[in-house]
Amino acid sequence: MGRIIRVTGPLVVADGMKGSKMYEVVRVGEMGLIGEIIRLEGDKAVIQVYEETAGIRPGEPVEGTGSSLSVELGPGLLTSMYDGIQRPLEKLRELSGDFIARGLTAPALPRDKKWHFTPTVKVGDKVTGGDILGVVPETSIIEHKILVPPWVEGEIVEIAEEGDYTVEEVIAKVKKPDGSIEELKMYHKWPVRVKRPYKNKLPPEVPLITGQRTIDTFFSIAKGGTAAIPGPFGSGKTVTQHQLAKWSDAQVVVYIGCGERGNEMTDVLEEFPKLKDPKTGKPLMERTVLIANTSNMPVAAREASIYTGITIAEYFRDQGYDVALMADSTSRWAEALREISGRLEEMPGEEGYPAYLASKIAEFYERAGRVVTLGSEPRVGSVSVIGAVSPPGGDFSEPVVQNTLRVVKVFWALDADLARRRHFPAINWLRSYSLYLDSIQDWWHKNVDPEWRKMRDTAMALLQKEAELQEIVRIVGPDALPDREKAILIVTRMLREDYLQQDAFDEVDTYCPPKKQVTMMRVILNFYERTMEAVDRGVPVDEIAKLPVREKIGRMKFEPDIEKIRALIDETNEQFEELFKKYGA
């Protein structure tokens, strides 16, 4: 038990704290606010408090809990909404109304709810960390696998029969090699700053299909990959994150609203229960865990929310699921680090951020990956991390963006100019990149189309050529261009408007499956080949621009039937043949 000697914003200094350890959770003051020790000097402890510290004064008690900041992992995580330190917001609302009272806690997993447990092991079986004890149908989409905690191994001496149990009831007893008995419940705790162990990492060879054409075709992310979405205000970071949370083919989505506006989390809460998962037809909320740590919540908890989210994601990965984690936005987390570092009077680095910013960001993104899990029957699971970065004024040379780019393999650069032109998703195809293309192209070739990479590279080359031509057009006007280059501008406009642009609010266009993406690309590239042939055969470019099929190509993104889109290839060819006849080419 210690006493407060100093309070500065979210930081509290207490003395008489001998015997405490780093990152231990403490209760601060008469109100019992939750805090975490982040520095120890002699018997003094520096504590970052995860709640508003107004009204606390020197002399009040500080009590250690003996455990580090941990999350509860078990049935009940899905469909829940937590704050940054895994307090269930719905439960807190029942306890204190719309405004959360300070010092309030509630168990993260519901203690009174009974779950239907079906054992998969029997007495006498040998188990190690990561083995599955049994399964619980948590939602209609996800079957929750009850895992042996990583530190336990031994022989099952008792296992619960199939039936309904709460998370607090003992469902198994394991005799460890030293003869002691470990009681296992449906949940276990895990410290958030420690990454969960696995057997080994696998190369990222399977793409995370998002249903967004720009991303899947040009700048793919692999399952277990890392991506950053930097962009200025209003360029569509949050809507892009929402689209990925809705439609990506991950089985579980963890969405962290870290220091962003509260209304954006409200949007997710309003929309997700109504939206249907394209694969199962069930509400999307049934595969989602939300962590809300909005801009009006205490700054210190932003740091915790990032770690809480990634630990929950790793837990579902250990069950053999593909998990997508959205962090919106990591800039606010970095700003929280900057504020706490300033209060600790540490030497500032670039733009006032702490010198350890780069290693903190790397540590977070390194917890992504596709892995073989622990256990006697290894499974494959993955955590893909997609972090939004909001640099002030859209300046990509800012430290958070630069340090993030060193670590992540995919960069989706959002562009304010594109957003102003109402071109969404506003991902700038000239500045963005993906380093996963070589490793995932085999999957595309095997499962979708053997010419995927060739078509993607052709389209990319056309878009780059367009950027060069646009500069010439700005100086001398479009009429000075030769016919071939005028024709390229017609095709690239189709690529931009009919392929890259996508309507997140249209029922059909919000999600574009891989087969449809490839068919659409084939239609446009076929038009390009025929256009070049027509120009070489002397057909005027103006005539090509007037072809009626162009309007149909413009509407194909709203057409759910792939065969109807494929039919546009024949229609294009017929209309070009008529042009050739007309001009005797």
Swiss-Prot record:
Keywords: ATP synthesis, ATP-binding, Cell membrane, Hydrogen ion transport, Ion transport, Membrane, Nucleotide-binding, Translocase, Transport. One of its GO terms (biological process) is proton motive force-driven plasma membrane ATP synthesis. It is found in: Cell membrane. Gene3D superfamilies: 2.40.30.20, 2.40.50.100, Bovine Mitochondrial F1-atpase, Atp Synthase Beta Chain, Chain D, domain 3, P-loop containing nucleotide triphosphate hydrolases. ATP binds at G231, P232, F233, G234, S235, G236, K237, T238. It is an enzyme of class 7 (translocase). SMART domains: AAA. One of its GO terms (cellular component) is proton-transporting two-sector ATPase complex, catalytic domain. It holds the Pfam family ATP-synt_ab_Xtn. Its main location: membrane. Its EC number is 7.1.2.2. It is a peripheral membrane protein. InterPro entries: AAA+_ATPase, ATP-synt_VA_C, ATP-synth_a_Xtn, ATP_synth_asu-like_sf, ATP_synth_asu_arc, ATPase_a/bsu_AS, ATPase_F1/V1/A1_a/bsu_N, ATPase_F1/V1/A1_a/bsu_N_sf. It catalyses: ATP + H2O + 4 H(+)(in) = ADP + phosphate + 5 H(+)(out). GO terms for molecular function: ATP binding; ATP hydrolysis activity; proton-transporting ATP synthase activity, rotational mechanism; proton-transporting ATPase activity, rotational mechanism. Belongs to the ATPase alpha/beta chains family. PANTHER family: H(+)-TRANSPORTING TWO-SECTOR ATPASE, V-TYPE PROTON ATPASE CATALYTIC SUBUNIT A. Has multiple subunits with at least A(3), B(3), C, D, E, F, H, I and proteolipid K(x). Component of the A-type ATP synthase that produces ATP from ADP in the presence of a proton gradient across the membrane. The A chain is the catalytic subunit. This is A-type ATP synthase subunit A. The lineage of its organism: Archaea, Thermoproteota, Thermoprotei, Desulfurococcales, Desulfurococcaceae. The gene is atpA.
